[in-house]
Regions:
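Short amphipathic alpha-helical surface patches that mediate protein-protein
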Residues: 123, 389, 445-448
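A structural signal for short hydrophobic/aromatic patches embedded in well-ordered alpha helices
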Residues: 49, 118, 384, 443-444
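Short, amphipathic C-terminal "tail helix"
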Residues: 438-453
Length: 453
């Protein structure tokens, strides 16, 4: 696709075709992905999102802002919706287009190249007075820039994580919450797609976002659990899009099923509401009570001092490193004189159960590749191991586990701590929780990764 192709499509208002060609030919470069967290929303997903806005919205010249315009996918789609919706009000095609790009559409991006691309797509002959901002959108003052107080709708796919070149933290902090805070305040409708980690994450930034969202008038949430919604980009925990509507007065729907956002501390998928209500009373004393973090015995320094001397303390490491290493006793600063169940700190993907489980005696420790659960003796260890291999236990973990990570005790808060005086299996566990055939059938229908029986 060259410049003349773009001009021809724009001139003849073949916007739908132009929108699809953006996905094919105008692709974010690796540096743009890394520095600006730029990820293009696929054409079909953009259409799906825009279809959720009532058709009559596009029949009036509302103001719509795309705050992270990228390569222009949403920008062109928004124009296309207005071109259809305003046909009766403005029969003349050229006049209609001018009203849309002069009065309805606003867009912004930090990348000058993206602004140039959007200008080229919208106005290849430089005929119109476009409303755009080149710079950090989070610092944009729309009153100063455009002499307006807010928008009828804000639509987009904001950056997800901070620029890695601006931090020494290997765990990049989320930033999309800042976009939600800013733009939900200055729009009647906010339609964003973001990672779904905010549903359950205990990261303080996302925990605060979850509390904020519970008090917003969210009309719907559509969640995709798969981590491959975006081409060549993996989003752990999946992605979701939501619509905040200040004029909405009903209950939120999650994947088209009504839910109560405030009922639990996390955002719970609808299919689990009835089931969780049955066993919620058992959650007060839970598996997090026994939890020991991945750094309980080793830190980055002592992990480098592991050796192959079998006379030292046995330390379980990852399979890639041979599963078993050893460490001098005087290198261990914390008490390890207890039995423990260990499991890899990274298990499969989001919404999965436990990976492999091992019993360690009171003379053995583990590396930072594992988390563990502290018990008093072999009998309790065997009991806990049997409990942790039951399918129900894996399901309860998966509900709060949005990514592969088990490094926060909060993901175990909905796994009741059962008596460790018996061997558990699925039948015994179902009876313990007084589950009926309907509940058991539900458990059997759940498909998830995990090492369970």
């Amino acid at each position: 696709m060259d410049l003349e192709d773009i001009r021809d499509l724009a001139k003849t208002n073949q916007l739908n075709q132009l929108s699809q060609l953006i996905d094919k030919y105008i692709i974010p470069q690796e540096l743009e992905k890394k520095t600006n967290a730029e990820v293009s929303t696929p054409y079909k997903l953009r259409q799906e999102m825009l279809d959720k806005i009532p058709t009559d919205f596009w029949t009036k010249p509302h103001t719509v802002f795309e705050p992270c315009s990228g390569k222009g996918g949403f920008v062109i789609d928004i124009i296309d919706r207005f071109m259809t919706g305003l046909t009766d009000s403005y029969p003349d095609e050229k006049q209609r287009y001018k009203i849309i790009v002069d009065q309805c559409l606003y867009f912004s991006d930090i990348n000058p190249t993206n602004i140039f691309i959007c200008q080229l797509l919208i106005d290849p002959y430089n005929e119109y007075k476009l409303n755009y901002n080149e710079g950090d959108t989070l610092k944009l003052d729309i009153t100063t820039k455009w002499d307006i107080a807010g928008f009828d709708a804000i639509i987009g796919n904001p950056p997800y994580n901070e620029d890695p070149t601006n931090t020494n933290d290997p765990h990049m902090k989320p930033v999309y919450q800042n976009w939600i805070y800013k733009f939900s305040k200055i729009s009647i409708i906010l339609l964003f797609i973001t990672p779904s980690k905010w549903f359950t994450s205990q990261d303080i930034l996302l925990y605060k976002l979850r509390d904020y969202m519970k008090n917003c008038k969210i009309e719907f949430i559509i969640h995709y659990a798969n981590d491959n919604v975006f081409k060549n980009v993996t989003i752990k925990g999946g992605v979701s899009y939501f619509l905040i509507n200040k004029k909405f007065g009903g209950e939120t729907t999650f994947n088209n099923i009504q839910i109560d956002l405030k009922k639990y501390d996390i955002i719970l998928e609808p299919k689990y509401y009835k089931f969780i209500s049955i066993i919620y009373k058992y959650f007060e004393i839970n598996l997090s009570k026994l939890y020991c973090s991945q750094g309980t015995f080793l830190n980055s320094k002592t992990e480098k001092e592991l050796n192959n001397n079998t006379n030292d303390i046995l330390c379980y490491v990852s399979k890639n490193k041979g599963l078993k290493k050893y460490l001098e006793k005087n290198k261990i600063n914390k008490d390890y004189n207890y039995w423990k169940i260990i499991t890899p700190a990274a298990a499969y993907k989001g919404s999965s159960g436990f990976s492999n489980l091992y019993i360690l005696n009171n003379y053995e420790i583990h590396s930072r590749s594992y988390v563990s659960f502290k018990v008093n003796n072999l009998e309790e260890a065997e009991s806990l191991l049997s409990y942790m291999t039951c399918k129900l236990t894996h399901i309860l973990l998966s509900i709060r586990k949005q990514t592969h990570n088990l490094c926060n005790s909060d993901v175990f808060k909905w796994i009741p701590l059962v008596p460790l005086d018996r061997k558990w299996n699925n039948i015994i566990l179902h009876k313990y929780f007084n589950l009926n055939d309907e509940h058991i059938d539900f458990i059997n229908t759940i498909k998830l990764d995990g090492k369970y029986i």
